From Swiss-Prot:
GO MF term (any one): protein serine kinase activity
Residues modified as Phosphothreonine: T179
Disulphide bridges: none
Name of the protein in question: CBL-interacting serine/threonine-protein kinase 1
Organism for this UniProt entry: Arabidopsis thaliana (Mouse-ear cress)
GO biological process: response to abscisic acid; response to osmotic stress; response to salt stress; signal transduction
Length: 444
């Protein structure tokens, strides 16, 4: 047995995927394996999810791969496993992910039992911070469970496995999701009813189940008979131990409200006194985006010429909301829903090509007196005039995302500066290159 393991290690050692050297297998799933990988340039370690295309051929993979991969780049949060790069060969999709070494929260509870309320609340706070961030990006997980909550070396949680088991159904005219997905014990009643549901509300239900397990060590709804299990879920009202604090009991009860309309929201959760005890908000990495240059190639899917990564000098960029779109559990509905929050980030659509858009944007902002720095499909725009407070007038990043060949999204992101000037810039660009009507612009 030992000899066989040594032979397997020798066989695995030296396997290459571009600049990555693949090592031991960390896990296996329905569509492939997860392997340890080391970046031979930086020396950093990663986990590579290797997906066999032949196993998802019946899911219209070739069509769905046209979705926009750059959406994954938006998910930059300390409590969400980071996707660093996606490499595709003729037979495989290779997702280079952040390596999380602490195992599953599920295993910790199975081994050690329930957490104390203080420790459990800390885990729950991190979970809600991560999910709240996803929802703010218009992304809904839809398969939240303890097995999809990992722990890093410091014991902090990392939400993972946004799903690769099936393709999502499209939103219908009612604006609701109609795909029944998720693990039975964690699924919300409205999902089981298959009448359409709000992705955010269903995620809150699943988080409520997770909180219950963290604090009690058992599932709120469980039965070997699926029909009975579904009846329990739809009824709600799980037994809540009296030894939990009133705040914890109230939180569980409000999260496991079978009515999605009256179920507590993320805002309500964060406003509760129980949640706010010793709460230290997690800070997303979004604000670093304007300061740190990111090689766009690191967030594109490159079509390798072979499994070893010896491709042509001009790799094919695969447009893919797809790595999210492939998932029955990860939905992007909110990405294009209007939000009256602030003007820090504005998106609008255009029928022009990405190349033409960048040229037109550069011309327009130059005429307005802005300086421009260009890199890949991104422009960094600055107005150097200082206001009365001595601050630089405005700094904005403009980026183009391809949804399909005849449709692009222009995203403007303000780092700092005058909101009035930012609005003038947006209105000029919308006039010159945009197709969105005022009702279709997305403001976040």
């Amino acid at each position: 047995m030992v000899r066989r393991q040594e032979e397997e290690k020798k066989a695995e050692k030296g396997m290459r995927l571009g600049k990555y050297e693949l090592g031991r297998t960390l896990g296996e799933g329905n569509f492939g394996k997860v392997k340890f990988a080391k970046d031979t340039v930086s020396g950093h370690s990663f986990a590579v999810k290797i997906i066999d295309k032949s196993r998802i051929a019946d899911l219209n993979f070739s069509l769905q791969i046209k979705r926009e991969i750059r959406t994954l780049k938006m998910l930059k949060h300390p409590h969400i496993v980071r996707l660093h790069e996606v490499l595709a060969s003729k037979t495989k999709i290779n997702m280079v992910m952040e390596l999380v070494t602490g195992g599953e929260l599920f295993d910790r509870i199975v081994s050690n039992g329930k957490l104390t309320e203080t420790d459990g609340r800390k885990m729950f706070q991190q979970l809600i911070d991560g999910i709240s961030y996803c929802h703010s990006k218009g992304v809904f997980h839809r398969d939240l469970k303890l097995e999809n909550v990992l722990l890093d070396a410091k014991g902090h949680i990392k939400i993972t496995d946004f799903g690769l088991s099936a393709l999502p159904q499209h939103f219908r005219d009612d604006g609701l999701l109609h795909t029944t997905c998720g693990s039975p014990n964690y699924v919300a009643p409205e999902v089981l009813a298959n009448r359409g549901y709000d992705g955010a509300a269903s995620d809150i239900w699943s988080c409520g189940v997770i909180l219950y397990v963290i604090l009690t060590g058992c599932l709120p709804f469980d039965d070997r008979n699926l029909a009975v299990l579904y009846q329990k879920i739809c009824k709600g009202d799980p037994p809540i131990p009296r030894w939990l604090s009133p705040g914890a009991r109230t939180m569980i009860k409000r999260m496991l409200d079978p009515n999605p309309v009256t179920r507590i929201t993320v805002v309500g959760i964060k406003a509760s006194e129980w949640f706010k005890l010793e709460y230290i908000p997690s800070i997303p990495d979004d604000d670093d985006e304007e300061e740190v240059d990111t090689d766009d190639d690191a967030f594109s899917i490159q079509e390798l010429g072979s499994e070893e990564g010896k491709g042509s000098d001009s790799p094919t960029i695969i447009n893919a909301f797809q790595l999210i779109g492939m998932s029955s559990f990860l939905d992007l509905s909110g990405f294009f829903e209007q939000e009256n929050v602030s003007e820090r980030r504005i998106r609008f659509t255009s029928n022009s090509s990405a190349k033409d858009l960048l040229e037109k944007i550069e011309t327009a902002v130059t005429e307005m007196g802005f300086s421009v720095q260009k890199k890949h499909a991104k422009l960094r725009v600055k107005q150097e005039e200082r206001n009365q407070k001595g601050q630089v007038g405005l700094s904005v990043t403009a980026e183009v995302f391809e949804i399909k060949p005849s449709l692009n999204v222009v995203e403007l992101r303000k780092s700092y500066g005058d909101s009035c000037l930012y609005r003038q810039l947006y209105e000029r660009l919308l006039k010159d290159v945009g197709t969105s009507s005022p009702e279709q612009e997305i403001v976040t």
